[in-house]
Amino acid sequence: MKRSIAFVLFFAVLFSCNEEQQKPETMLVPSANETADMNKAWNQEEQELIHQFIARKGWDMIETESGLNYLVYKNGTGAQAEPGMKAMVDYSISLLDGTELYTTQSSGPRPFQIDKDNVEQGLHEGITYLRVGDRAKMIIPYYLAHGLMGDHEKIPPLASLVFDIRLLGLSD
């Protein structure tokens, strides 16, 4: 018994002496220019993925200056949406790979105040291109959606979103 304990202790001491002390890792913080360059590269890569997605779908979308893409595929005849109005919408939200994340199909239409409520920035912009009764596809890049963090529920970090949306009504 003493022999086995001595044997185990000998190897424990032997192997512990050979281990190098690990130095704490130094965390390098990127400069403002490096951060801007990383964001620019991410944005360009994301726009490329979005353009490839649009080409695969064969959609003739309009791209806005901000990077939002939209296509009205069914025209309504109602009033034009404007900032400050309350919009009532039906929608489904999915990722570029087709994974459906959210839909109003089970919860019912969703109201939000344009340019006021806490919804995706791209939705605030995109809804202003619609009239009551319009059905549209919108591709909202991650930087106009939930950004670097996602929504901590279903939307992952850096995720561009595909909205299939119908503007049901507007009120002041």
Language-model segments: residues:
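Cross-family detector of peptidyl-prolyl cis-trans isomerase
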Residues: I5, C17-D172
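Sec-dependent bacterial lipoprotein signal peptides
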Residues: M1-F15
